[in-house]
C-alpha cells in the first residue's frame, strides 16, 4: 500500500473510502478529517498486506483529494500538503514537509523532521516522533506516546496531551497547551504563551518574554523566568522556579514551592494562592496579599511584602526586609543579623524571633509574642507590641510607641521620647526609662529599672531587683518587697510602699508619701523625703539627708551624722537622734524619742510618749505631757511640763529653764535643774540631785 491515495465520498455507501490515484471522487469534498474518523482510517491502513518494497517520494503535492501513507522504510522528501493528508507509521519517515492546509499524521514509530506548518495540523501519537518542526500558523497535536523535539512555534499552536511529550520547544509568537497527562520539557518562551492544565506538566521551561499559565491540576517544574510572566492558579503548581527578571503570580488556589527570586524578579501571591520554601535573593521581591500565603521563605537580601489579608509563616530573614502592612500578617519569622522586619499600618507579626536583626513596629503596626535573642525591636509612632521576651537583645520604645507585657530575662528595654510600656517583667535584665518615656506596672524580680531625664514610672513592684531614679526621673506607687529603690541626682518618687526591701534617697533625690511596712528607708547626702509612714520598718536619715512629716506608727526613725528631720509624728514606734542628727517639731503620741551622742531636737511635743536625752544629746523647747528622761550627760532647755507630764533628771543629766505647768520635775542622783519655773505642779529633788 506504499503509494499515493485519494479519499473520495461514496454516494451509495454514504461514507469516505480510500481509492487509488486513478479513481475520481464524486460528491462532497472535505477540508480536514475529523480526529474521531481518523482513528478508523488509520486502522484500515494498518491491515495486513502483501509486503512491498520501500518507496521514496520527492516533491509531492497533496491537495484536498489526495493522501500519502508511509511505512516500513518509506520516505518522503519536500512534500507539500495543500489540503490532503500524509500518514507516517511503522518506520516510515517524512522529511522537509510543508503543511499549508490538511494534515500530517505520525504514529506507530513513524517519524517526521524539518516540518513547516503554515496551516492545517500535524498529529503525533502512538510512538510517532517529530523533530525540527516550525509552526507558523497551524496546529501540532502530540498524544498517546508521541513526541516532538526542537519545535519552533511562531504563530501557531502546539497541543500536548494524554502521554504526549514535547522537548526543547521554542515559542516565538504562538501557543503551547499541555494537558491531560501531556508533558513539555525544556520549552523556551520568547514571546508566546504556554498553558499547562488538567494533569499536564512542564519541566525546565525558560520564559524570556512570554507567558506561562499553570492551572487546574497542571504543574511546572524548574522553570526559569528571565523577563516574562508565570501564572499559577486554580489548582496549578510550580516547583523550583527561578525568577531572574520576570514575574511569577500565584493566585486562586495555585501553589508554588522552592521558588528562587533573584535580582529584579517578582513573585505575587494572592487570592488563596500559596508559596512554600521561597528564596528571595538581593534585588528580588515577594508580594503577598488578598488571602495569599507564603511558608518557609528565606530572605537573603530581597524584600517580602505582606498586606491586605496576605500571610506568611516561618520566614527566615538573613538579610533584606520583610514588610507587613494594611492587614497583612506573619507568624514565626526569624530575623538574623542584617535582616529587618517592618510592621506598620495595621500589619501584624506573631511569634517573631530576633536573633541579631531588627524588628521595626510603627504607625499602627503590632507585634505579638516576639523573642529577642540578640538584636533590636524598635516601637515608635503608634506601633504597639505585646508579650515580647528579651533574652539578650534590646527593645526600644519611643515617639508614641507602646509595649505591653514584656519579659526582660537578659538584655535591655529602653523607653524614651513619649514611648510607653506596661506590665513589664524584669527577671535579669534592665529597663531604662528616660526623656519622656513612661512605664506602668513593671515587676522587677531580678535586674534593674532605671528612670532618668524626664522618664516616669508608676506601679512598679520590686521583688528582688533594683529601681534607680535620677536626673529628673520619677516613680509613683512603687512597691519594694525585696530589693532596692535608689533615688538620687534630682530623681523623685511618691507613694512608695516598702514591705521588705530598701529605699535609698541621696544626692538631691526626693521621696514623697513613702510607706515603710517592713524594710528600710535611707536618706543621705542631700536626699530628702516627706510624708513617710513607718508602720513596721526603719527610716535612716544621715549625712545631710532630711525627712519632713514622717509618721512612725511602729518601727524606727534613726537620725544621725548630719541628718535632719522635722514634723515627725511618733504614734507607736521610736525616733533615734544621734551623732549630729537633728529633729524639729516631733510629736510623740505613743512611743519613744531617744537623743544621744550629739543628737539634738527642738520643739518636741510629748503627748503620751517618752523622750530620752543622754550622752551628749540635747533637747530644746520640748512640750511635755508624757515622760522626759535626761541622763548621762544629756541636756534639755526650756521644757514645758503640763499636767500629766513628768521630767526626770538623773545621772549627770541637766535641765535648764524648765517650766512646770501642772506636771512634775524629778531631780535625782547627780541630775541637776537650773532656772526652773514652777507655775503649777511639783518639783521633787532626791538625794544627790541639785537645783538652782
Language model regions located:
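Thr-biased low-complexity repeat/linker tracts and other Thr-enriched repetitive architectures
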Residues: 85, 89-100, 105-266, 270-303, ...
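Short acidic, Pro/Gly- and aromatic-enriched capping/linker segments at domain boundaries
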Residues: 1-6
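Short N-terminal segments immediately surrounding and downstream of signal-peptide cleavage
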Residues: 56-72
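Gram-negative bacterial Sec-dependent N-terminal signal peptides
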Residues: 8-53
Amino acid at each position: 500500500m506504499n503509494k499515493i491515495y485519494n479519499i473520495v465520498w461514496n454516494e451509495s455507501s454514504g461514507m469516505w473510502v480510500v481509492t487509488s490515484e486513478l479513481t475520481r471522487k464524486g460528491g462532497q469534498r472535505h477540508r480536514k478529517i475529523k480526529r474521531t474518523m481518523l482513528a478508523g482510517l488509520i486502522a484500515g491502513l494498518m491491515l495486513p498486506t502483501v509486503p512491498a518494497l520501500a518507496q521514496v517520494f520527492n516533491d509531492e503535492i497533496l491537495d484536498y483529494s489526495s493522501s500519502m501513507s508511509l511505512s516500513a522504510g518509506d520516505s518522503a522528501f519536500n512534500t507539500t500538503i495543500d489540503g490532503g493528508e500524509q500518514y507516517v507509521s511503522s518506520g516510515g519517515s517524512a522529511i522537509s514537509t510543508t503543511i499549508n492546509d490538511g494534515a500530517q499524521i505520525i504514529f506507530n514509530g513513524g517519524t517526521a523532521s524539518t516540518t513547516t506548518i503554515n496551516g492545517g495540523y500535524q498529529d503525533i501519537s502512538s510512538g510517532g516522533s517529530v523533530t525540527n518542526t516550525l509552526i507558523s500558523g497551524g496546529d501540532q497535536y502530540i498524544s498517546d506516546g508521541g513526541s516532538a523535539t526542537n519545535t519552533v512555534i511562531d504563530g501557531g499552536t502546539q497541543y500536548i496531551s494524554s502521554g504526549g511529550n514535547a522537548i526543547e520547544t521554542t515559542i516565538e509568537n504562538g501557543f503551547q497547551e499541555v494537558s491531560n497527562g501531556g508533558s513539555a520539557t525544556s520549552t523556551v518562551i520568547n514571546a508566546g504563551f504556554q498553558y499547562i492544565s488538567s494533569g499536564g506538566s512542564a519541566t525546565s521551561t525558560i520564559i524570556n518574554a512570554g507567558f506561562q499559565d499553570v492551572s487546574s491540576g497542571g504543574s511546572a517544574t524548574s522553570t526559569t523566568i528571565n523577563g516574562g510572566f508565570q501564572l499559577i492558579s486554580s489548582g496549578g503548581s510550580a516547583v523550583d522556579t527561578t525568577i531572574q527578571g520576570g514575574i511569577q503570580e500565584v493566585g486562586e488556589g495555585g501553589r508554588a514551592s522552592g521558588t528562587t527570586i533573584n535580582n529584579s524578579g517578582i513573585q505575587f501571591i494572592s487570592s488563596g494562592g500559596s508559596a512554600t520554601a521561597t528564596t528571595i535573593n538581593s534585588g528580588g521581591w515577594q508580594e503577598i496579599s488578598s488571602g495569599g500565603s507564603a511558608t518557609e521563605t528565606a530572605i537573603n537580601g530581597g524584600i517580602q511584602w505582606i498586606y491586605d489579608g496576605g500571610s506568611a509563616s516561618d520566614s527566615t530573614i538573613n538579610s533584606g526586609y520583610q514588610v507587613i502592612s494594611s492587614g497583612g500578617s506573619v507568624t514565626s519569622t526569624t530575623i538574623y543579623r542584617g535582616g529587618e522586619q517592618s510592621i506598620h499600618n495595621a500589619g501584624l507579626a506573631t511569634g517573631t524571633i530576633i536573633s541579631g536583626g531588627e524588628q521595626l513596629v510603627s504607625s499602627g503596626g503590632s507585634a505579638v509574642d516576639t523573642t529577642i535573642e540578640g538584636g533590636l525591636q524598635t516601637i515608635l509612632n503608634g506601633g504597639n507590641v505585646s508579650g515580647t521576651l528579651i533574652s539578650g537583645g534590646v527593645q526600644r520604645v519611643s515617639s508614641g510607641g507602646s509595649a505591653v507585657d514584656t519579659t526582660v530575662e537578659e538584655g535591655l528595654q529602653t523607653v524614651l521620647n513619649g514611648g510607653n510600656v506596661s506590665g513589664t517583667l524584669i527577671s535579669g535584665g534592665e529597663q531604662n526609662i528616660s526623656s519622656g518615656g513612661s512605664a506602668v506596672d513593671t515587676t522587677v524580680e531580678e535586674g534593674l529599672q532605671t528612670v532618668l531625664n524626664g522618664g516616669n514610672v508608676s506601679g512598679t513592684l520590686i521583688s528582688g531587683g533594683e529601681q534607680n531614679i535620677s536626673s529628673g526621673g520619677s516613680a509613683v506607687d512603687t512597691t519594694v518587697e525585696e530589693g532596692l529603690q535608689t533615688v538620687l541626682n534630682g530623681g523623685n518618687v511618691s507613694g512608695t510602699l516598702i514591705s521588705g526591701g530598701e529605699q535609698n534617697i541621696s544626692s538631691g533625690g526626693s521621696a514623697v508619701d513613702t510607706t515603710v511596712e517592713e524594710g528600710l528607708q535611707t536618706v543621705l547626702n542631700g536626699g530628702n523625703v516627706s510624708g513617710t509612714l513607718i508602720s513596721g520598718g526603719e527610716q535612716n536619715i544621715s549625712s545631710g539627708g532630711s525627712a519632713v512629716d514622717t509618721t512612725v506608727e511602729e518601727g524606727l526613725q534613726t537620725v544621725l551624722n548630719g541628718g535632719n528631720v522635722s514634723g515627725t509624728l511618733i504614734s507607736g514606734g521610736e525616733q533615734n537622734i544621734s551623732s549630729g542628727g537633728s529633729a524639729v517639731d516631733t510629736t510623740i503620741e505613743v512611743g519613744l524619742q531617744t537623743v544621744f551622742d550629739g543628737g539634738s531636737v527642738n520643739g518636741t511635743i510629748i503627748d503620751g510618749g517618752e523622750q530620752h536625752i543622754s550622752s551628749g544629746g540635747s533637747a530644746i523647747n520640748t512640750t511635755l505631757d508624757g515622760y522626759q528622761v535626761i541622763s548621762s550627760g544629756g541636756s534639755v532647755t526650756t521644757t514645758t511640763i503640763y499636767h500629766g507630764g513628768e521630767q526626770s533628771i538623773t545621772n549627770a543629766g541637766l535641765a535648764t529653764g524648765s517650766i512646770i505647768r501642772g506636771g512634775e520635775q524629778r531631780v535625782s542622783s547627780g541630775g541637776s535643774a537650773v532656772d526652773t519655773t514652777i507655775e503649777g505642779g511639783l518639783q521633787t529633788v532626791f538625794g544627790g540631785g541639785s537645783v538652782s
